[in-house]
């Protein structure tokens, strides 16, 4: 008999030296874990400074470490990664100048800047939004309101939602959703409390009226927060938007709606040339005081559909289970079919030639069964399931659940919840997102 020997796969620690103004960039596969330690120097991830000799762990994300001064990092990963180091000093000079310009606006008025960031895919929009919030915290005791209007990204919530979150402390650089909201376990950083509105569909084109309605509801909550909180009002609002290919760029209806609802006074265009900034200045010349262009950073890694799906899966898992450093303990609860009332948003692709006569902002009640709900993500609203269906349009989201098992014969199902609770007696909205453990 022959015995087969299995060689143990070990992680080899590698080092990278980063000159001042250079950025270390790597894409971490979803199934791999990268650990990074800054040995000396000052380095940051999207505006958040990394402590020396502290391990940071990343899974399924793109990591960008920028050296403010000469730095040395140690890193290890079982997967063979190919990080690249590029000079990025000029890009950060743009960011610093923009940050100082926003600070002047904060000092000149009790109403802080309201910035809308627009651009095509892979131009650094989301990274810019995160950096502007992080840099604001370094200047004074600000609490900028970070707004995400891209339903394909999970920001302090799950994909399918749009959110508004006051940022009062450091963002969690290890988290794929930028940090934890109210969760079931202890976290290293202060939990954020986002205002969450559910869109539920994957693509904006599938229901533009519902998307605009959802923006209106989120903006209403934002305006109320700004009215009641002078610190947040003076700190300003930083808004990240979907990539332009998902928006109507013929008459700019969605961008115009965002400008109107959030009282935008500045637009930041992430683009290689001035063409987009010039077009927007012509369309919105009477509404916007200033439009500036920021060129994309040279360290951008394009996110394709496969990576987007993998990242969304990481975000869903992290919402329920936490990160490798902050493990959460979700709860699985059983329930009968009769205990759930579930609605779903309408999709324009289902209506064919009759779509002009359909109210796409209405939600349809669905049957509770395995074909509809198996492995589905559901949004739990703040309204009773006995309330009028009309109130769904203005409902906020108190959390999300994952339907892990549906038994049609016994009319029973199991729901994974992030907090210990019975099945909430609330109306629920089915999203298009699924997660199979």
UniProtKB/Swiss-Prot annotation:
Alphabetical GO biological process terms: mRNA 3'-end processing; tRNA splicing, via endonucleolytic cleavage and ligation
Location of this chain's protein in the cell: Nucleus
SUPFAM superfamilies: P-loop containing nucleoside triphosphate hydrolases
Top-level taxon in the UniProt lineage: Eukaryota
UniProt keyword ATP-binding, yes or no: yes
Binding residues annotated for ATP, in chain numbering: 23, 122-127
Keywords from the UniProt entry: ATP-binding, mRNA processing, Nucleotide-binding, Nucleus
Gene Ontology CC, one term: mRNA cleavage factor complex
Family as reported in the entry's similarity comment: Belongs to the Clp1 family. Clp1 subfamily.
Function: Required for endonucleolytic cleavage during polyadenylation-dependent pre-mRNA 3'-end formation.
Subunit structure: Component of a pre-mRNA cleavage factor complex. Interacts directly with PCF11.
Record protein name field: mRNA cleavage and polyadenylation factor CLP1
Record organism: Kluyveromyces lactis (strain ATCC 8585 / CBS 2359 / DSM 70799 / NBRC 1267 / NRRL Y-1140 / WM37) (Yeast)
Name of the encoding gene: CLP1
């Amino acid at each position: 008999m022959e015995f087969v020997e299995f060689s143990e796969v070990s992680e080899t620690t590698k080092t990278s030296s980063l000159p001042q103004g250079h950025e270390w960039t790597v894409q971490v596969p979803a199934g791999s874990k990268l650990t990074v330690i800054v040995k000396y120097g000052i380095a940051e991830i999207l505006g958040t400074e990394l402590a020396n000799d502290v391990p940071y762990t990343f899974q399924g994300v793109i990591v960008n470490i920028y050296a403010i001064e000469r730095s040395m990092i140690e890193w290890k990963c079982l997967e063979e990664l190919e990080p690249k180091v590029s000079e990025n000093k000029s890009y950060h000079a743009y960011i610093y100048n923009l940050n100082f310009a926003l600070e002047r606006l904060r000092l000149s008025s009790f109403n802080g800047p309201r910035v809308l960031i627009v651009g095509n895919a892979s131009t650094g929009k989301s990274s810019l939004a995160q950096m502007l919030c992080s840099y604001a915290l370094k200047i004074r005791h600000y609490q900028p309101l970070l707004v995400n209007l891209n339903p394909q990204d999970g920001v302090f919530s799950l994909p399918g939602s749009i959110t508004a979150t006051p940022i009062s402390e450091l963002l969690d650089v290890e988290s794929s959703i930028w940090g934890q909201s109210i969760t079931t376990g202890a976290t290293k950083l202060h939990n954020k409390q986002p205002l969450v509105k559910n869109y539920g569909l994957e693509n904006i084109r599938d229901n533009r009226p519902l998307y605009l309605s959802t923006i209106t509801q989120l903006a209403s909550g934002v305006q109320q927060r700004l009215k009641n909180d002078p610190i947040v009002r003076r700190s300003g609002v930083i808004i990240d938007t979907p990539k332009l290919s998902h928006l109507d760029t013929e008459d700019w209806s969605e961008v115009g709606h965002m400008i109107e609802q959030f009282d935008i006074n500045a637009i930041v265009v992430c683009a290689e040339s001035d063409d987009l900034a010039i077009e927007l200045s012509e369309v919105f010349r009477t509404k916007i005081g200033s439009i500036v262009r920021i060129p994309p950073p040279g360290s951008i890694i394009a996110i394709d559909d496969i990576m987007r799906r993998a990242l969304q899966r990481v975000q869903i898992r992290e919402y329920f289970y936490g990160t490798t450093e902050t493990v959460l303990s979700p709860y699985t609860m059983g329930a009968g079919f009769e205990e759930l009332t579930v609605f779903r948003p309408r999709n324009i692709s289902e209506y064919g030639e009759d779509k002009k006569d359909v109210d796409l902002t209405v939600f349809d009640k669905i049957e509770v069964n395995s074909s509809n709900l198996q492995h589905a993500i559901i949004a739990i609203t703040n309204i009773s399931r006995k309330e009028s269906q009309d109130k769904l349009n203005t409902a906020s989201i108190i959390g999300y659940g994952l339907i892990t098992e549906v038994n049609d014969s016994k009319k029973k199902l199991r729901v994974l919840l992030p907090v210990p609770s019975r099945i909430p007696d609330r109306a629920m909205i089915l999203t298009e997102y699924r997660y199979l453990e």
